[in-house]
Regions:
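Conserved small-residue
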Residues: 205-274, 722-809, 840, 849, ...
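Short, small/polar-rich motifs associated with maturation and membrane association
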Residues: 1-333, 338, 345-347, 421, ...
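Extracytoplasmic gating/loop element in the C-terminal half of outer-membrane beta-barrel translocons
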Residues: 271, 570, 835-928, 933
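Glycine-rich, aromatic-lined ligand/substrate-binding cores of catalytic
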Residues: 808-843
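Acidic/polar loop-and-plug regions of large Gram-negative outer-membrane beta-barrel proteins
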Residues: 277, 353, 358-421, 474, ...
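Extracellular/periplasmic, surface-exposed regions of secreted and cell-surface proteins
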Residues: 133, 329, 335-344, 349-354, ...
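Short aromatic-centered micro-motifs
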Residues: 2, 29, 136, 383, ...
Length: 975
């Protein structure tokens, strides 16, 4: 910059710049974290080499902690992680960005629907029935998150937040960092800070990106006609009927060719054989040949001493793998910060979003295009000879399934979400060190769902058409009054304290209407149907109020102390138990601040810290919901008991312990963080079933009866390995976490059996409880199970085998690593994620790989071919197929339980920045082109599992829409 003129330029990545100057003018060179240098222009100056020196008073890295307060990382006593560059991937929502990138954070995708939610767990599972997802806070206020839709799959409130508008994400993991938020933070807190304007001239930024979408994992392939028939031949010959009638496959084929089989199950095989020349590829019909993703964002920001502003407008659309499946979004973020007087600052932040989701059914539904790929016969024609869809008879095809290609055109499943989040803030400097802050943040969400089922074919045929309309309206607000005091005593003593009052209220209304019998095939509104089927609505109103006090003290940043206490009152409980008290204490000492270590210069941090506290957890509990009045008895209002009053019902509480070590070398060019954590949950809420004599078959009593523990280690290393004057930079980082989860107390210590799993004292919350598969009898091809559920003696009789604990869906070791290499104008970023020690159960395999039980009806997986027992293949993975099944071989067991160990290349980005000198005269400050890929490569260590190891939330996969792989091309422009 030319001193005294305000005229200046930014250097390119090589340090080159071009600026017209006059003799005698002074050039000023500056950069954040470096000492400013001044050079006088002289007539003989031809070349200027500048090397800025690090500023010993470099601005410290800060993170946002409780209620918008910023704190230097080196002064923390708690477990906090920070993510920058959130937009360096193709994830639509910020919850998916967290997966694999933060120590102690694990989870999975719930659906391959674009814009769907992710399951996020911080340091294990907080509760059996309560909240296991973290609280999300945007710019200091808690917000709604998750899927609030009533019917359609894939709704995600957080998908309404544009990642390009996010400055950073901070993850709070222990008591000292979360207790100030109080009653519902046992599962952690995710703090999202959005971008703000900075002092300077208006800065315009435009980014555009277009990409190709494909499957992240190929998954199981469907059978071809030839493959299906080969299995059916063997299954029929292995049956009593087939083995008695035909001595060989050649004899069977001879009769099939002349159409001689007309009785028994052989007639079914004959009818299928007669259609052997039809080869319908259902996957090809229902999936996109070329799915696309596209987005464009435009922002303007700037400011001066009085006013700063940031405004953005963004558009995004992403197709799913299957047809008629997409997510489309428009977002806008508008932030203004105005210094009204020397003491008064006013801020507004308004975020708007509109999202339109076109969903497809998931799970074991005939209308699910993924389910149909395996269940529909390849011998069934999708189209008639005239080009119209084949609708079969009575609304279904020959095996009772639906033409999924037709349903994608006939039916629709739409979801429209409007979200408004406003944040109005006032800061007033009461005295020199005393600041008052007032925050009012309302949030409004409107979700409209429109489900239409055609009367022509499929699940709307029997009802002559169906229309389901749902509406969800959520209005909430957050009110805060905060008084903060900061004081420095004799330079080395620093004290800060905050007194906080917070109120939060959420009002949610759900309304739905179902009508049947369409008046016309072309009219799809409710008023176009003849028969009203049902109308219902609910309202949930929850409020809470809390008071908190926080205190931070440090002596020369050497000794650190954090204290907090909070009182919360929640409407979920009776008055006697509505009040909860939460606290935390954190201690730390940074030995690198001692004179002895300062002299070495190599050690920049050596901090030991520990924290402990008591935090709460939210449960959808209602101790006073005794009756449900939603039943008709002889045209009179009727109610049934659904619960029993329990005035003793109270908070679930957690007691997190954290012990940490943070080390930095060479001005933090190398950093290492180690932490041990232990999180105990007490007074877990369970719903105990009551006998029918006490109410109804569904009546329960909610009680506090359980305890649980999570513990583990976290290790994170980051290093700036190379940084030289030639423009070569190399950064390398990684993190690894361990987790041990155990239930330590239950009601009467009695195990509770769930679907495929069990809750049992001394075991993990996520353990599978199954019979153990022992393989195939090499002599007979019969299925085998271990009698005791573990090892030793085997049996081919399913009922003789016992169930036993067979592993957990929670990974015991997980993490990620990344590297970034840049040379002059070129940069390469790679991010990996991994997980080990967990199990995945394929619930769909019992239908799609069931050894002839229903194979003649529903073909299933192509992996059946060549993998089952024959006299020539005795050491096989699967039993011999028998028409109508082989000794219950497809019943639940560890046969369909896989190791979830995986390694994935999550993100790969290659970018090129045009040199600044090339942009002279173009009004451009920056021009960058890049290639960005997400989920480009995945390695499953268990070769039997063909699916996506992250496409699960609770260890089960079941015909969900495929997870997405994207490869995008984009550009960034600043002017």
């Amino acid at each position: 910059m030319i001193e005294g003129t305000g005229k200046g330029v930014a250097t390119d990545i090589n340090g080159s710049f071009s600026l017209e100057v006059k003799n005698g003018q002074v050039l000023t060179f500056s950069s954040v974290g470096y000492q400013t240098q001044h050079h006088v222009v002289t007539p003989d100056l031809k070349k200027l080499d500048i090397s800025l020196r690090l500023d010993v008073e470099e601005i410290p890295e800060v993170v946002v902690v409780g209620f918008g307060k910023k704190q230097a990382v080196k002064e923390l006593t708690g477990a906090v992680s920070k993510l920058d560059n959130v937009a360096d991937n193709n994830s639509i929502s910020v919850d998916k960005v967290l997966l694999g990138r933060v120590a102690g954070v694990q989870g999975g995708t719930i659906s391959g629907q674009p814009g769907s939610t992710a399951s996020v767990r911080i340091r294990g599972v907080a509760s059996v029935n309560g909240r296991n997802e973290p609280v999300y806070v945007i710019d200091g206020v808690r917000v709604s998150h998750g899927d609030h839709a009533q019917n359609t799959m894939g709704n995600n409130v957080l998908a309404g937040l544009n990642n390009d508008d996010i400055e950073s994400v901070t993850i709070l993991k222990d008591a000292v960092s979360t207790a100030v938020y109080g009653a519902d933070t046992g599962a952690g807190v995710v703090i999202i800070t959005t971008k703000s304007g900075k002092k300077g001239a208006a800065d315009f930024h435009v980014s555009s990106e277009i990409g190709l979408v494909s499957r992240a994992a190929v998954g199981e392939k469907p059978l071809t006609t030839e493959q299906w028939l080969s299995i059916l031949y063997d299954a029929y010959l292995n049956s009593e009927e087939g083995s008695a009638a035909y001595p060989s496959k050649e004899a069977l084929l001879a009769d099939l060719q002349v159409g001689n089989i007309s009785a028994g199950t052989g007639s079914i095989l004959q009818s299928i054989y007669n259609q052997r020349h039809t080869h319908t590829d259902w996957r090809k019909l229902v999936e996109n040949n070329m799915a696309l993703s596209q987005k464009i964002n435009a922002t303007v920001s700037g400011g001066n001493d009085k006013l700063s502003y940031y405004s953005s407008l963004g558009y995004l659309k992403e197709d799913g793998i299957v047809k008629e499946n997409s997510f489309e979004r428009v977002t806008s973020s508008n932030k203004i910060d105005f210094q009204a007087t020397s003491k008064l600052r006013l801020s507004t932040n308004i975020q708007l979003s509109y999202a339109n989701t076109l969903a497809q059914p998931e799970g074991a539904q005939y209308s699910n295009p993924v389910y149909g790929q395996y269940m529909l016969r390849p011998t069934e024609r999708a189209y008639n000879s005239d080009g119209s869809f084949n609708y079969g008879q009575y609304g279904m095809l020959s095996n009772g399934t639906y033409n999924i290609a037709a349903l994608q055109q006939l039916n629709h499943n739409k979801n429209q979400t409007i979200r408004t989040l406003a944040n109005f803030q006032l800061d007033y400097q009461v005295a020199k060190n005393l600041l008052y802050k007032f925050v009012f943040a309302p949030e409004y969400i409107d979700i409209g769902e429109d489900v239409y089922k055609s009367p022509i074919h499929g699940d709307g045929f029997l009802t002559k058409g169906e229309a389901d309309w749902f509406n969800t309206r959520i209005f909430s607000f957050n009110l805060q009054n905060i008084l903060s005091y900061d004081l420095a005593i004799k330079e080395k003593n620093h004290l800060s304290a905050s007194l906080i009052q917070e109120a939060h209220r959420i009002d949610q209304k759900n309304i739905n209407a179902v009508v049947l019998t369409a008046g016309s095939n072309k009219l799809k509104t409710l008023s176009s149907f003849i028969t009203p089927a049902s109308v219902s609505g609910t309202r949930d109103l929850n409020s809470r109020e809390g008071y908190a006090l926080t205190l931070h003290y440090d002596y020369d940043k050497l000794f650190l102390l954090d204290l907090s206490g909070r009182q919360d009152r929640l409407s979920n409980f009776w008055k006697e138990n509505r009040t909860g008290y939460f606290y935390s204490v954190g201690l730390g000492v940074d030995l690198a601040r001692l004179d002895f270590f300062r002299k070495t210069k190599q050690l920049s941090q050596l901090k030991f810290s520990t924290s402990y506290g008591r935090v709460g957890n939210m449960v959808n509990a209602s101790p006073y919901a005794t009756y449900r009045y939603s039943f008709n008895y002889d045209n009179q209002a009727a109610g049934i008991p659904i619960g029993v009053n329990n005035p003793d019902l109270h908070w679930e509480t957690l007691y997190p312990l954290n012990i940490g070590l943070d080390v930095g070398f060479f001005s933090d060019r190398i950093t290492l963080s180690v932490a041990y954590f232990q999180k105990k949950t007490k007074d877990m809420i369970f719903s105990l079933p009551l006998s029918a004599a006490q109410g109804s078959y569904t009546a329960t009593k909610q009680v506090n009866i359980g305890e649980m523990e999570n513990k583990g280690w976290e290790l994170a290393i980051n290093a700036e390995l190379i940084k030289n004057e030639e423009g070569l930079n190399w950064e390398l980082g990684g993190h690894i976490s361990t987790l041990s989860n155990k239930i330590t107390q239950m009601y009467d210590d009695t195990p509770i059996k769930l679907n495929l799993r069990v809750l049992q004292k001394g075991e993990s919350i996520g353990v599978f409880y199954l019979k153990k598969w022992a393989g195939v009898d090499p002599n007979t091809g019969a299925p085998l199970w271990y009698k005791n559920g573990k090892d030793g003696e085997t049996t081919s009789v399913y009922s003789e085998a016992k169930e036993a604990i067979q592993g957990s869906y929670l990974a015991s070791l997980y993490g990620g690593f990344n590297t970034k290499i840049s040379y002059k104008n070129i940069s390469l970023l790679a991010q990996f994620a991994y997980g080990f020690g967990n199990k995945l159960y394929d619930s769909s395999a019992s239908l799609a790989k069931n050894d002839g039980k229903t194979t003649y009806l529903y073909p299933g997986y192509a992996s059946q071919v060549g993998s089952y027992w024959t006299p020539q293949n005795r050491n096989s993975e699967n039993p011999k197929p028998i028409w109508d099944g082989n000794a219950l071989s497809s019943e639940d067991s560890t046969r369909y339980l896989y190791d979830g160990d995986y390694l994935r290349l999550q993100t790969l980005k290659l970018s090129y920045d045009f040199p600044t000198i090339w942009l002279e005269g173009t009004y451009l400050k920056q021009l960058q082109f890049y290639v960005l890929g997400d989920n480009l490569w995945t390695y499953n260590f268990d070769k039997r599992f063909k699916g996506d190891p992250e496409a699960q939330a609770d260890g089960r996969v079941d015909f969900i829409l495929p997870t997405l792989r994207t490869l995008s091309f984009g550009m960034n422009i600043n002017f």
